[in-house]
Each structure stands twice: as structure tokens, then as C-alpha cells.
């Protein structure tokens, strides 16, 4: 929603002009880097009746963020959350746990970042498994590494690097 800040601001002005912000609560998805590049946008959205923005942070580990080609850092996530909270807009953040490159250390980094974001006002929406859909760059990398699997229309990858089931449960406690 926020990839074109001028368009989002124009829409917010129209919402305000029509008075929709007094009757309707809006929610949208956004990119963390868009908010960092347009630091007043959360306030504009809040004034127009937006209650929350949903962000895919994906990981608290720089190596995993690079693997997903996010183009952001954990510091960007913290700045984005602060900008939203300061401007009365709830940031809702989601993460991917146990991705193909995750290790015990990267999962710990992600959980630590999620805790910091929550303590600073973010809602943590969910964590999910990565689905490597056919034709995506991640599926291509997994195929190249011999880790990609398909079963009918179910797409998955071999288990996390060195993370057996009992170790995964230990990380979550």
C-alpha cells in the first residue's frame, strides 16, 4: 500500500475529505523500507483512520534478511516501529521461522528482535513457515541446493540446518 507514498497520501486526503475516517477503521500492508523513506506517512495514515500497518520483517538476522533479499536491517525494523508508534499507528509485524537457511543462532536473533519490537509497541502477528512456490527465486536456490521438494501442490524444503525437532522445541521455550 505504501510503495507509492504520494498515492497513499492522496488517498488519505480523499478519505478525510469524504469523512470515511470517522466511520471506518482501515488496515493495510506496508514495507518497512517505505516507512523509513517516508517517515511522516504513518501519521498521515493514522489521521485518515488507519488503525494498523502489517509488515513482513521475516527475520532478525542480517544473513537471513540478505537471503530473502529484503533490503532492510533489524535497525530499520526498530525505526519503522518507533515511527508508527510515535504517530499513533499500530505496527503489526510477522516473521518466518525455520526457513531453509535458519540456524539456532538466527532463530534466537529473530526471537530477540520480535521481543524488542513487541516491548516497543509492535504487535507480533504470527510466525510462519516459508513456502517455496515454483518459479520464485527462493525455490530456484533450493532446487540448486537439492533441498526443494514437491508433493502434489504442496511445496516445501528439507529441514532446517542442524535443527532437529527436539532442538526446535528447546529454542521456543
Summary of predicted features, one role per range:
Residues 1:
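Glycine-rich Rossmann NAD(P)(H)-binding loop
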Residues 5, 12, 16-173:
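A structural motif corresponding to the C-terminal lobe/cap of the Radical SAM core domain
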Amino acid at each position: 500500500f505504501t510503495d507509492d507514498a504520494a498515492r497513499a497520501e492522496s488517498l488519505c486526503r480523499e478519505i478525510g475529505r469524504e469523512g470515511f475516517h470517522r466511520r471506518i477503521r482501515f488496515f493495510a500492508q506496508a514495507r518497512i523500507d517505505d516507512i523509513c523513506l517516508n517517515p511522516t506517512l504513518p501519521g498521515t495514515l493514522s489521521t485518515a483512520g488507519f488503525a494498523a500497518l502489517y509488515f513482513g520483517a521475516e527475520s532478525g538476522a542480517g544473513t537471513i534478511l540478505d537471503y530473502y533479499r529484503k533490503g532492510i536491517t533489524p535497525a530499520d525494523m526498530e525505526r519503522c516501529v518507533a515511527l508508527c508508534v510515535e504517530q499513533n499507528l499500530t505496527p503489526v509485524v510477522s516473521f518466518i521461522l525455520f526457513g531453509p537457511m535458519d540456524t539456532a543462532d538466527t532463530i534466537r536473533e529473530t526471537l530477540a528482535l520480535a521481543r524488542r519490537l513487541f516491548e516497543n509497541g509492535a504487535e507480533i502477528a504470527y510466525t510462519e513457515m516459508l513456502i517455496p512456490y515454483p518459479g520464485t527465486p527462493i525455490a530456484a536456490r533450493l532446487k540448486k541446493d537439492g533441498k526443494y521438494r514437491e508433493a502434489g501442490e504442496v511445496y516445501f524444503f528439507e529441514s532446517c540446518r542442524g535443527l532437529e525437532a527436539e532442538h526446535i522445541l528447546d529454542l521456543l521455550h
